[in-house]
Curated annotation (Swiss-Prot):
The gene is wecF. It catalyses: beta-D-ManNAcA-(1->4)-alpha-D-GlcNAc-di-trans,octa-cis-undecaprenyl diphosphate + dTDP-4-acetamido-4,6-dideoxy-alpha-D-galactose = alpha-D-FucNAc4-(1->4)-beta-D-ManNAcA-(1->4)-D-GlcNAc-undecaprenyl diphosphate + dTDP + H(+). GO terms for molecular function: 4-acetamido-4,6-dideoxy-D-galactose transferase activity; fucosyltransferase activity. Belongs to the glycosyltransferase 56 family. It is found in: Cell inner membrane. Its EC number is 2.4.1.325. It comes from Salmonella typhi. Disulfide bonds: none annotated. GO terms for cellular component: plasma membrane. This is TDP-N-acetylfucosamine:lipid II N-acetylfucosaminyltransferase. Pfam families: Glyco_transf_56 (PF07429). Pathway: Bacterial outer membrane biogenesis; enterobacterial common antigen biosynthesis.
Length: 359
């Protein structure tokens, strides 16, 4: 039997760390198909912190792709589970036959599915990638992303799977730490990545609420982002008074980030694709509603779980936000499919499918 190999095809430290720790702590003990990894980027202590995994690191996305292609050609029974991916060379290999469809199983993370960049290189590449994505052996994704993908590639198998957000189920029914009344605190974006469209989001919040709310913008990740942070701060201060705007430029530890989220009343996310599911989960767990773009298909996952969904096109005010909070508080969080530990069983199923051990 050939052991399934997992591929983290791009150097995205935060996401890669979450996946590796999840596999090390939760899945590795269940079988050999959850232990072999090829990772783009440096070790950064992963080998030491994930002793249950066999990890191989590659200095660039291209070097990793070349190694994957070589393995795929050497043994056509070798299967790969691509997590996220974001690696042009791998898509081209699937398109050219370097990697066969039966060898390629893909967990969609969002950005690699949608065509949102206006850069010329990306606009030229998107049609090729779209063709390649129709050749994968199978995909795993959120309900909304599965629906989006199926419209383009109805013949490709799709299975429900959620990113393994770090969550403490004991907090699902936690007592409220403060009375939700008075001035609203709104979280804008889930990181400092430009895909959050922070400036447009700040303008949208101002248009809805004016300078009457506290606005918190977490921008400590990714690193080396000071010029963009300054740009967002300048745009924010043109709209909001200094005491109402908090731009967080330092990376936060998980517990500090969790505490920050729980001080908010509303999350505001205008990106037109699925992303930031970890932050969304933590907000929902704390009975904090989220405002989504109607083009972000994750609203389908939320609606399926009977969670209130607010849209950027809605007329928003404090009364609407408080009612959404009340509705969230009445939901039994233990039954939400994309919460821990409910997302575990689909991961076991995904491993068996990708390894060729399940029909």
């Amino acid at each position: 039997m050939t052991v399934l190999i997992h591929v983290l095809g791009s150097d995205i430290p935060h996401h890669n760390h979450t996946v590796l720790r999840f596999f090390n702590d939760t899945l590795a003990a269940t079988g050999e198909h959850a232990r072999e990894f090829m990772v783009a980027g440096e070790d950064n202590g992963f080998t030491e912190s994930c002793p249950a995994l066999s990890l191989r690191f590659y200095g660039s996305k291209k070097a990793l792709a070349q190694a994957v292609i070589a393995k795929a050609k050497a043994n056509r029974r070798q299967r790969f589970f691509f997590h996220g991916q974001f690696n042009i060379s791998l898509w081209l290999a699937l398109l050219s036959g370097g990697i066969k469809p039966a060898q390629f199983y893909w967990h969609i993370w969002g950005a690699d599915l949608y065509e949102v960049s206006n850069g010329l290189k990306f606009r030229l590449f998107y049609p090729l990638r779209r063709i390649a994505q129709g050749r994968v052996g199978g995909v795993f994704a959120t309900r909304g992303d599965l629906s989006y993908f199926a419209r383009q590639h109805p013949g490709v198998r799709g299975e429900l799977l959620y990113f393994p957000t770090r969550m403490d189920p004991s907090l699902n029914a936690m007592a409220k730490e403060r009375q939700r009344a008075g001035k609203l605190t709104i979280l804008v974006g889930n990181s400092g990545d430009r895909s959050n469209q922070h400036i447009a989001a700040l303008r949208a919040v101002y248009q809805q609420f004016g300078d009457t709310v506290n606005v918190v913008v977490p921008m400590g990740y990714p690193a080396n982002n000071q010029a963009y942070i300054d740009e967002v701060r300048q745009a924010g201060l043109a709209l909001f008074s200094a005491e109402n705007l908090q731009i967080l430029s330092e990376k936060m530890e998980f517990d500090a980030y969790l505490a920050l989220l729980r001080q908010c009343d509303l999350g505001y996310f205008i990106f037109a694709r699925q992303q930031g599911i970890g932050t969304l989960c933590l907000l929902i767990q704390a009975d904090i509603p989220c405002v989504l773009n109607r083009d972000n298909p994750f609203w389908q996952d939320m609606a399926e779980q009977h969670l209130p969904v607010l849209f950027t096109t809605d007329d928003l005010n404090e009364q609407v936000v408080r009612e959404a909070q009340r509705q969230l508080a009445s939901v039994d969080k233990s039954g939400i499919t994309f919460f821990s530990p409910n997302y575990l069983q689909p991961w076991h199923n995904a491993l068996r499918i990708a390894a060729g051990e399940a029909e």
